[in-house]
Amino acid sequence: MPSPRPRGSPPPAPSGSRVRPPRSGRSPAPRSPTGPNTPRAPGRFESPFSVEAILARPDPCAPAASQPSGSACVHPAFWTAASLCATGGLPWACPTSWLPAYLSVGFYPVPGPRVAPVCGLLGFGVTGLELAHCSGLWAFPDWAPTEDLQDTERQQKRVRTMFNLEQLEELEKVFAKQHNLVGKKRAQLAARLKLTENQVRVWFQNRRVKYQKQQKLRAAVTSAEAASLDEPSSSSIASIQSDDAESGVDG
């Protein structure tokens, strides 16, 4: 009959099996499961692209205590730029380098667009859709250089054609016969005088206007001369008065 074993002692190994003695007096510590929040052992290098490193990264869209409540997920650099502008760390303007790439798109290359305390970024919750409608966010200072629209809209002055004496004489001869020259005749005259059809057309148009003015002036002069012939002259009136006076004296 086997003797009773003491309490707490390990059970006897079966016959025929080899028993490995422990390497040390301490029992091996149980392995702890690796999780996303498990601290890494010092001295061990892990790749930042490993599964554990990716899972251990904090959510970039998690609400921070320094950002306004109810705001959308906005890059932290945007709030940093707005806070620096509001607290006086920078002047009224913040350069576009303080903003992330997706917010700085669309700025014109002028120094200092106004980004500082607009739409209550530090006091009220602003969503991503409201940022596009904020007045002053995309505004520019009054002294910013702007393109002069009047110069672009101003029509260029038409270059006046200089005709030589031979061309003017030929044009006057044709105008004396026909005041309006169109079609094939105008093309032939332009080719003969080494001019374009547009130049000939403009000359005839201006010549007709001049001719109408001359006709009106001649009509006015003719009417004035006719009126002067109908009225008695001052010398005839004086002679009539003197004759009346002499006849009165004789009577």
UniProtKB/Swiss-Prot annotation:
Region ranges (Disordered): 1-47, 224-251
Biased composition (Pro residues): 1-14
InterPro entries documented for this protein: EMX-VAX-Noto_Homeobox_TFs, HD, Homeodomain-like_sf
One BP annotation, GO: motile cilium assembly
GO cellular component labels: chromatin; nucleus
Source organism, top-level taxon: Eukaryota
This protein's record includes keyword DNA damage: no
Gene3D superfamilies membership: Homeodomain-like
Biased composition (Low complexity): 15-35, 224-242
Keywords (A to Z) from UniProt: Developmental protein, DNA-binding, Homeobox, Nucleus, Transcription, Transcription regulation
UniProt xrefs under Pfam families: Homeodomain
This protein's record includes keyword Transcription regulation: yes
Subcellular localization(s) per the UniProt record: Nucleus
DNA-binding feature ranges: 156-215
Function: Transcription regulator acting downstream of both FOXA2 and Brachyury (T) during notochord development. Required for node morphogenesis. Is essential for cilia formation in the posterior notochord (PNC) and for left-right patterning; acts upstream of FOXJ1 and RFX3 in this process and is required for the expression of various components important for axonemal assembly and function. Plays a role in regulating axial versus paraxial cell fate. Activates the transcription of ciliary proteins C11orf97 homolog, FAM183B and SPACA9 in the embryonic ventral node.
Protein name from the UniProt record: Homeobox protein notochord
